[in-house]
């Protein structure tokens, strides 16, 4: 019989163990580039799915790397996972990739973990604190498709925009004060933001759509057009400008 793990502990263990696995296969050096990324996606997905099947067999499951099962829509508890957020960054040796683990209950992330393995840290909703103090005067954006609205907001605030890889990495760098806001308007899916939002909201950051509406998860359509994560004192100004 396996030991019972509470939700917070299971969330942490999933993120940390997946980080260890992904760093392990990359450090072997037998694969590189796309082959390494594909292997990382598969390994992380299979590991997380098997652990959840054993420890939370009655919960729903939504992952970027698995076929969607509509049965999740009838469940109050759903795990929303991105096993490897930033596959390209991982495969090319960059540090801005992440692991997203979120338990969503009735549409809201209640337990979340975002692992940044190359930085040796897992951020947890159960122990999250946002940095306060002087502004960094920087807004983090996608390095693939930085939205025009982010540049507009940055100009109005006297800030600059700066690109970074995975959504989890961007959100966590707002949390630790390297940036003041993360603005994305190019479209994402629920697994891109459920865990980062769970951690950032627990830490006291503002998290919403760009129209100010609440971010809700476990929808039939998992597409999410835009997102804002920022220091709470900047939220009203950014939402008005956006």
Set out the residue ranges of the language-model regions:
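Hydrophobic/basic alpha-helical segments enriched in Actinobacteria
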Residues: 10, 18, 25-29, 57, ...
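Flexible hinge/capping segments at coil-to-helix
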Residues: 127-137
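An extended, acidic
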Residues: 135-242
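N-terminal subdomain of lithium-sensitive/metallo-dependent phosphomonoesterases centered on the IMPase/IPPase/PAP
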Residues: 1-84
């Amino acid at each position: 019989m396996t030991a019972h793990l509470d939700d917070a502990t299971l969330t942490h263990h999933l993120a940390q163990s997946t980080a260890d696995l992904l760093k392990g296969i990359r450090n072997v050096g037998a694969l590189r580039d796309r082959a390494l990324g594909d292997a990382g996606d598969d390994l992380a997905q299979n590991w997380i799915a098997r652990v959840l099947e054993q420890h939370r067999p009655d919960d729903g499951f939504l992952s970027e790397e698995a076929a969607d099962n509509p049965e999740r829509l009838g469940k109050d508890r759903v795990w929303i996972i991105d096993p490897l957020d930033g596959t390209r960054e991982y495969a090319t040796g960059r540090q801005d990739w992440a692991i997203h683990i979120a338990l969503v209950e009735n549409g809201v992330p209640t337990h979340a973990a975002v692992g940044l393995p190359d930085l040796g840290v897992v951020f947890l909703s159960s122990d999250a604190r946002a940095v306060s103090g002087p502004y960094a005067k920087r807004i983090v954006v996608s390095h693939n498709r930085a939205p025009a609205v982010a540049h507009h907001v940055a100009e109005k605030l006297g800030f600059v925009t700066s690109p970074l890889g995975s959504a989890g990495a961007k959100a966590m760098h707002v949390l630790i004060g390297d940036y003041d806001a993360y603005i994305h308007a190019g479209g994402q899916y629920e697994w891109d933001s459920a865990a980062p939002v769970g951690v950032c909201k627990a830490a006291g950051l503002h998290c919403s759509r760009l129209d100010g509406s609440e971010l809700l998860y476990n929808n039939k359509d998992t597409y999410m057009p835009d997102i804002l994560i920022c220091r709470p004192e900047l939220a009203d100004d950014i939402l008005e400008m956006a």
